[in-house]
């Protein structure tokens, strides 16, 4: 039986183009969202386009360990490592949420070597808006 002839330029074998377009980003914004269950770190450029992101869950932490300060530190380190390779030198930090990972993520960002222009707390606070849910009785 004859062998099937393979096409020279089949789409499976040839990669069309680079999937991620790497560009030099000198300045960016680091968003840290720290809840009690997880910490999400997103790095954007000045216009708000996402460059890199990481969370405690994607770093391999499961369950209640995602809300720990060490998990937040690891997530921040992973998100910043990719953008520092792209040449980011200055950043602004926006921290949102009441979680345990706020300070640990900020410590990891400071240690990364990126110069911080300012650190802003953007946690949403109601001006007596909607009624809050009832307190848990444990």
From Swiss-Prot:
UniProt entry tagged with the keyword Plastid: yes
Lineage: Eukaryota, Viridiplantae, Streptophyta, Embryophyta, Tracheophyta
Keyword Zinc-finger carried by entry: no
Keyword terms: Chloroplast, Plastid, Ribonucleoprotein, Ribosomal protein, RNA-binding, rRNA-binding
GO biological process, one term: translation
Protein's name according to its UniProt entry: Small ribosomal subunit protein uS11c
Gene Ontology MF annotations: rRNA binding; structural constituent of ribosome
Pfam families reported in the protein's UniProt record: Ribosomal_S11 (PF00411)
Family, as annotated: Belongs to the universal ribosomal protein uS11 family.
Subunit structure: Part of the 30S ribosomal subunit.
Region (Disordered), start-end ranges: 1-22
Subcellular location as annotated: Plastid, Chloroplast
Lineage top rank: taxon: Eukaryota
